[in-house]
Amino acid sequence: MALKARALYSFQGENKEEINILENEELHLFSDVSLDGWLQGTNSRGQTGLFPASYVEILRPRSGSVQVDYSGHTQGYTDSPHQGSYDDDEEDDDDWDDWDDGQTVVDEPSGSNGVSRSQLQHHHHYPRPEYTHRPRPALERQDSIASGKRGSVVGRNLNRFSSFVRSGVEAFVLGDVPQFGGVSESHAIEMGPKGPQWKANPRPFSCSVEEPTKQTKFKGIKSYISYRLTPDPCNSPVYRRYKHFDWLYNRLLHKFTVISVPHLPEKQATGRFEEDFIQKRKRRLVLWMDHMTSHPVLSQYDGFQHFLSCQDEKQWKAGKRRAERDELVGASFLLTLQLPTEHQDLQDVEERVDVFKAFSKKMDENVLQLSSVVSELARKHLGGFRKEFQRLGAALQGLSHSFQLDPPYSSEPLVGAISHTGRTYEAVGEMFAEQPKNDQFRFLDTLSLYQGLLSNFPDIIHLQKGAFAKVKESQRMSDEGRMEQDEADGIRKRCRVVGFALQAEINHFHQRRLQDFKQAIQHYLKEQILFYRRVSQELEKTLHMYDDL
């Protein structure tokens, strides 16, 4: 039975985690337990997010207490890293082919801010309501009071749903993340010519994604597409479904809080077995795999290596559980980082982060604009250009037919040449319609990948900004005699870890950006040259038909 509430007052959300509610509006709650004075639920417009608990009245059944089942709402606030979740071929089944022998041990992440972007970013157009001003609720402070631990003297962030808090990075900076004895996993950051960078993978490799094949099970009741993955240099192929990629992607999000994990290509509810969609997803999985194998940290992740190599059912299940029970995830992953000895002034790091923040915002805007322009051009190739050239060809052939109506004055060679010209332009129209798959679609694949990568950085940068704020607060408290200098130095040291990790990720992003956009635009230009050369050759052949008239 769904848990419902009624809004006592109107509330206007002030950030992407909060939603608007109207007085007397009926709301659906995920739980009646408030977190620091906030509830999470869905309004009547389908928007999911947070609103003040004091602004609503929970509607409880009159007849006794009823056990409320929240399982139906789990998807409402579990992160969906790519839009659409109705892909029938992605449903969980029981057998080894699905690699799913039970529920996932570790809860899936909800993105860095705890609420699914796809749930928060609805594009409904409703008239803006009039809101009655009411002070925002006072948040409960029990978790902000200094505990007996020395590392928790600095006040905690009151917004318990910010990415800085939910990721655990706040707890790490304050020294509240427990140390693990005998940590075997480690990732080194070294100083390069342009600042901190991830140490290269000592065993670099690549992996091809090939042969998307439709397969069936349960005597044809279930259908799905599998892909052949062949890591190089081992050259031992494995076959994976999209849902297996999805499982891996969620493990990556759960573990690597400070790394921009490339987004998977989107799911699709209908038409997923159509050839165009299959090829599009394959192209984008190729790019995704290329970014994964080229990343010095992601490529060495045990879960990724297991995904690429395991072929045995029992071994897979053991490795799957191992990945899901990994304790070095989120903020604990920061414990695995080995930093260089070089000193970096935190103010310089903050300025560097601000520069990248402005850069990534501008690049994101321009990638979106370029993607829109290229998409429109591709649509014209498929529709408008093709249609116009076919109209031109038909008109020329109509002219040639009219020349035959007065036989004594008709010129067969000229009629034939004009008719051939018409057919040539019709063929050119078909060439325009076929061209996007050679250049524009591939360019759009790269732009889509970078839209995903860039969309990760605001939350990652927010982690660093939160760490900077804790350093400044701790230093102020130390100067006022309210904190030992050793404690403030510890916070500064842990902030340095976050700063080095972010700079290393920025460095890797720029390296890949330079390489990817060089290759993408080179490929686009080469294909455009070949295309117009073929068009030119067809027109030249037609032109020569007029030479001897």
Curated annotation (Swiss-Prot):
GO molecular function terms listed in the Swiss-Prot or TrEMBL record: phosphatidylinositol binding
Domain SH3: 1-61
BAR domain span: 346-549
Pfam families: BAR_3_WASP_bdg (PF10456), PX (PF00787), SH3_9 (PF14604)
InterPro entries documented for this protein: AH/BAR_dom_sf, PX_dom, PX_dom_sf, SH3-like_dom_sf, SH3_domain, Snx9_fam, Sorting_nexin_WASP-bd-dom
Keyword Membrane recorded: yes
GO cellular component: cytoplasmic vesicle; cytoplasmic vesicle membrane; cytosol
Membrane topology, record value: Peripheral membrane protein
Biased composition regions of type Basic and acidic residues, renumbered to the chain: 127-137
Role: Plays a role in the reorganization of the cytoskeleton, endocytosis and cellular vesicle trafficking, both during interphase and at the end of mitotic cell divisions. Required for efficient progress through mitosis and cytokinesis. Required for normal formation of the cleavage furrow at the end of mitosis. Modulates endocytosis of cell-surface proteins. Promotes membrane tubulation (in vitro). May promote the formation of macropinosomes.
Family statement drawn from the similarity comment of this UniProt entry: Belongs to the sorting nexin family.
The record's note on its domains: The PX and BAR domains mediate association with membranes and are required for membrane tubulation.
This protein's name: Sorting nexin-33
Organism: Xenopus tropicalis (Western clawed frog)
